[in-house]
Amino acid sequence: MKKRTRKKLRALWGLLLVPVVLTGCRIRTTPMGVFAQILEYAGQNNSQASSSHGHGTYHTESQPSSTPIPQMDYDSLDAIGEVQTIMVYLVGSDLESDYGNASLDLDEMETAGVDTAHNNILVYAGGASEWQDRGLSSDECTVLLLTDTGFVPVDTYPAENMGDPLTLSSFLNYGFDFFPADSYSLILWDHGGGPVLGYGVDENFRDLLTLDELSEALEDSVGAHMTKLEWIGFDACLMSSLEVASVLAPYANYMIASQETEPGWGWNYDFLSELSDEVIPGDVMGEYIVDSYMDYGEYVFNIYPNLYSDLTLSCVDLSAYAEAEEALNDYFAELDTSLDVQNYPRLVRNRARVRDFGTYSSDMNYGMVDVLHLLELVGNDSEAAQAATEAVENCIVYSDTNMDNAGGISICYPYQTDTDYRDACIEMLYYLDFAPNYTRFLEDFYAIENGDTLLADREISNAETSVTTQNDGAYDESDITLQLTPEQQANFASGGYYILCKARDEGYITAEEDERADDMYLFIQGSTRVTLDENGFLHAAYKNNAVYMQDQDGLSDIPMILTETDISDTENRYLAHAVLMNYTDNWESQTVKVQIVVSDEYPDGIIRSAIPLDHDDAELQSASKQLIHLDDYETMSLVARCSYVTRDDNGNLLNFFDWEKSGWMMGIDVDLTGDYHTVVQPLDHPENYVCIFFMKDSQGNTSYSEMIPLK
């Protein structure tokens, strides 16, 4: 009996409950995380102006925008630049109140060496419950102007809802009227939730800007001045999409945005040093912004490998957007014509393989997929697909990424998301009048998904299985197989497997401690790395090894609990849920998702990053822009839930996470104050481990195999 481990984890049972108590109702998430809160709040406070009136609800209400009356004598300012005015809409949110990221970016702007004699950097700051620096108040919104000595407050107003389109349009009109220049641009700073949810989370008013509200704000300002912004940039997550481009196209020449979530530090504002006495075209400035963002990210990763983050940033030519939308509209008309119950499963299998975004830092499925990768996998090389690919590529004037299959711009294609989110996407597409044939295709796709059952017998509990073990020179690798019926093969969408440990056989529990010890299992690893061969065999290639933690006290005596998150030929990515704790000064804890990568470069694995998770409600999905530095904490606790084998009324195994909880949890404490690292090594007793396959059919139904011993 491994008493040291078990005793630690009996104590951890209580600690896991602490973060919920400590976090209270703080919003520390991107828009999806707070969306349910926003809706609840808006429903109870209808007096709030211009908040979203339902889940993804789009409306056409409009209020005339006016320019705020200046509160200071502009003659007291030094000469105002007349070349470029860059307006920064800085919604501080929890990124400022909890982490001070907005203040840090203001510092970056000050130290960039901006030519303020010819250029205006104008900031509208608000939307945070607390400002960590700069003497700003959460009760106010402040206009800041960058001078050669730093930012100076120009005007101050009572706190305004930065999720109200009127607030944004008023700020833009303010910039046009009082800081005239040859060229104007806009940076939208904060969280982003993609086209369905929108941009910006005002902590004080619990509101954000949906795409219809963003369009309204731009029409009442940029449109009213009958001009165009040179570029609009999102220093925010998930906003490089065709749907967002459709909103910006009438009002700007270029869009600069990220397909993926951004790390908390966001853009590197050193690019402002490029400003001079001549107007810089948007495509050129876009290249500066993309390069500085990527260069700074790589710089951080080299110093702090465990702050690694996937990075994407693109500059999109909005003048080429209309042609891309038209080409996509033609392609999806063709695809929709061929969509029926026979080829639907093949389409689902390809959709499941498309690069998606936002999944690592969130439990939420945003449905954001790379357009070019989608066309590559689904397009079948038709002329319409090739024309759409070429048109989309023409939109992307410059992009960079450290990810595979991130081409520069996304589209929202929800798959296996909740119905509310899917319906909100459809409603958004209708409001934007975006590629009507694409909207029709999605509706037909979902009609089949929710229609009559395509697979009569989806159970795989009685399927033939086998395990073949061979040594690859380093480890014993098991090829675990499961035979599907012809009907199951035809309707196969995706699959995966779980590796479970027999708690009693591995020595974690005894019959004296729990009379049901023989039925108790620990979840060790989950993966979707399976292949279906031409003979209908589903294969899971599992190297009979596991990832352990090593600290100054030695090697952990149970493996880390991992879920594989990204299928790649070059590396294996896993997530582990953990609790970080400090004891010495102010006692604090932080729940996180830790990313571990195993590759040829890191055969023993490396901790790449940690994302905070603060859930007050299990139904709230959170995606964080912030990365956690493990060295700021003293202890990391990793746990595994122990559950009893549970079956349905027909005797089939349920999903492990629906098994009856035993009340026991096993795991380890890792000392972060000294040296710590991951170690990959073979399982001591693979005969104490089992594999369970799961299979999803084309309509999203899931079934589970019986437990398959590894040896």
Q: What are these language model-derived features?
A:
Residues 3-13:
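Bacterial N-terminal signal peptides that target proteins for export
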Residues 14-22:
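Bacterial N-terminal signal peptides
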Residues 34, 39-180:
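N-terminal extension/subdomain marker
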Residues 47-79, 195, 199-234, 239-711:
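Terminal, contiguous helix-loop blocks that mediate binding/assembly
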Residues 85-90, 120-125, 184-188, 230-234, ...:
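Structural recognition of the beta-strand scaffold that forms the well-ordered cores
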Residues 92-93, 127, 190-192, 415-417:
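Residue-level signal for short, function-critical loop segments
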Residues 125-226, 236-237, 242-243, 259-260:
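Catalytic-core segments of thiol-dependent peptidases
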